[in-house]
Amino acid sequence: MRIQALSLFLVFCLCGVQAQVKTSQIPTWVTPTEYSQSPAIDKNELSQGTLQLLRDNQTHLVKETVYIRQVTQVIDNAAIQEAGTINVDYDPTFQELVFHEINILRNSSSIDKLQPNNFQLLRREANAENYLYDGSMTAMVNLSDVRPGDIIDYSYSIKGFNPIHKGLFSNSYTFDGYSPVGKINVRLLSNKPLKYKGFNGLEKPFLNKINGLNEYTWTSTDVTPLTYEEYDPAWNINYKLLLVSAYDSWASVVNWAVNVYQENQPLSDDLSSHIEQIASATEDEGERIQKVLDFVQEDIRYLGLEEGIGGYQPFSPNQVYEQRFGDCKDKSLLMASMLKQLDIEAYPMLVNTTLKQSILDFLPSPIFFDHCVVKVIDNSGKVYYYDPTISSQGGSYAKTHFPDYRYGLVIKRGVREFDQISSRSENKVEVKDEYRLDSIGKGAILKVKSVYHDAKADQMRQYFKSQSLNAINKEYEKYYANYFYNIKSIEHPQLTDDVLANRLQVIEKYKIDSIWQPMEDKKNLIEVQFVPNSIDGLLFIPNVEHRKNPVSLDYPSHHIHDITVHLPAAWDIQSEIESVEHDSFDYQYRATYIPFVNQLKLHFEIKSKKDHITVEKFSDYSRKVNDLSNKLGYVIYTTSDGSSLTEFETGNGTLKIVGLIAVAALIIMILVVRSNQSARNDAYRRRGGFY
C-alpha cells in the first residue's frame, strides 16, 4: 500500500530514485512557436528573479497528447536555485512522460542539458497532510552550471488522458499571472468541433484546418501581471481565462456522472444489516436521516485515494463501509445508498466550493467541480443538503449547517440544470465580557462567556476536539495578551455543548494585573480600553474609496458582543446609541451607564446581509466602515491618583492601534478552527477531481 510509505508532514517522499526518463524528438504535429528574447514588458514588475519568455501548450486530442514548452530567462543570482530545477508531474496510471529538449541559451550558443540519467522520480503526495493520495509522480532534474542571463528552454509531452472522461476533452487555461510573460500560446487539434469561451477580453482563436483536423490557436504577447486586491472573492473571475469543452450541455455532464456513480452490485450483508439496525432503532424519517449522516460523517474517516480514475469515480458503498474511509464522493454515494435503502430519496450532488454563482458562466464539464455532497428529499417533498465530509456537526437533521456552495448539479438522470442552494444558518456568535475593576490604577477580573451557533459551533467543537485543554488555554492567554499586559488564566475554559441545538458555550476567566495603562501623550492620565475583539477584524477596512473588484464578506454571519464593566467608583458617562446601515451589513452600538451600581454596559452588533460588496457600492462601504472602525471600542480614563474621573472616549488613535493588533490575533484563531475544505480546493486546482 502506498499510504504506508507516506508521512503526513512531507510534501515529497524523500526516497527519490535515479531513473532514466523517456526522450524523443518533438512530435511532428507540433507547430514551432516563435518568441522574443526582449519582450515589451516592464521589468520592474518581475518577481523571483526570472522572466518567462514563452509558455506554450499544444494538445492533440486524437493522439491524447499534451506538448508543453517553457522558456525562462534568469535575471539574477537569486533565481538560479529555482530556475535551475525542472519538475514535471504526471499520473503513471494513465500517463507517460517524454522529454524532448532541455537547452541553455548563453551568448548566442545553445548548451544541451537533456541527460536522461540525471532525472529523479519522486512519489509526489502534495496533499498527504490533508489525507488525499493521488499517486502522482514527479520527474525532477537539477541543471548544472546555470548563470544569470541564461535562457532555459525545455519541452516535453505527456501522453494519455484520464479514461474516466471517455474521450470527452475539457480544460481551462489562464492568460494572466503574478509576473509578466512575453508570450502565451495555446493550440488545440481536434477531429470534432469544440466549445470554447473566453473571459475578460480574451481574443477569439485563430481557426484553421490541418490534415483534416480542426485547429484552434490563442496567442497573447507582452502579458502584463494581474493586479490583485485584498478580499477579492474566490468566485470573481477577473483574469483572462479560456474554457474548452466537448460536453454539449450540463445534462450530458449529469449523464456522465450517473454512469460513473452507478452502483453495480447489491449492498453487502454487513452494510444491509447496519441499515436494518438504523431502521429498527428509529421511528421517523428525520431520525433515520440523522443516524445515517452521523455514521458517514463520524465513523467513515476522511481519506481519498485519487489515483487515476479515482479522482472522479467513487468506491462502491460496500468497499467504503468495509474499509471505513473515503473522500467526498465515497462518503456521498454511501450516504445516498443507505438512505435509499431506508426509502428516503437521496442523490450525490456535484458542487464547486469556491466558484459559487460563477459556475453558471462556465462551459459544461465535470472538471469544473471540486466536491461532492448529498441532496435529500423527505416524504413531504422538503429538500435538505448535507456535506458528509464535515465532522463534529451539531443540530437536528432539519437544521444541520450546509456551507454556502450556492449551486449544485444533482447526479440524477433527467437533471438539466443546477439546484440553487440557500444557507439556513445564521452562524451567530454571542460574546459577553464582564470586567470587575479593582481600585483605580490596579488590576481586574475578566470573565468571558461565548456562545456559538450553527457553523461557528461546529468549528469550535472541532477545535476543542483536536487540541488539548492546556494548549487551548495557552492560546487563549496569548490571544488576550494582545489587549492586556500581564493577563493570566484563572481556570481552564469551561465547555458546554448542546449538540442537538448546535449551541456551544465557552466560559473563560482571567486575572489582569495591570489593566490601567498610561495614556499616550497625556501626562498623569491613565486609561482602560474595552474592545469587542470578536467583532474587531470582521469587516475589511480599506484605505481607498474605489477599487476594481468586489469585496468578500463572511456570510452568513451575526456577531453580538456585550461588555459589562463594574467600575470602582462613580463615573461621568453619558449614554449613547448609534447604528450604521449598509447594503451588505448592519451595525449597532449602544453605551449605557447605570449610576447606582457604577456599571457601564456596551453593546456591539454586526450582521452581514450579503457575501460581498459590489464595486458600485464600495465607495459608500469604504466611508461607512472607516467611520465604524473608529467606534469599535470604548475608553475610560482618569488621573493616575484617581482624583478626577473623566468622561469616556471612543475611537482614539491608541484604540485603533489595539484594534489592528487584534486583527492579526483574530486571524490566527480563525485559521486554527477552519475546516479542511480550502486544502481540498488547492488539490482541485492542481489536478481536478472531487474531494
What are these regions (language model features)?
Residues 1-6:
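Bacterial N-terminal signal peptides that target proteins for export
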Residues 20-670:
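A sensor for short, sequence-defined functional sites
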Residues 7-15:
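Bacterial N-terminal signal peptides
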Residues 14-15, 47, 686-687:
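Intrinsically disordered, low-complexity segments enriched in small/polar residues
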Residues 8, 37-39, 679:
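Compositionally biased regions
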Residues 670-679:
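Cytosolic-side junction of a single-pass transmembrane alpha-helix
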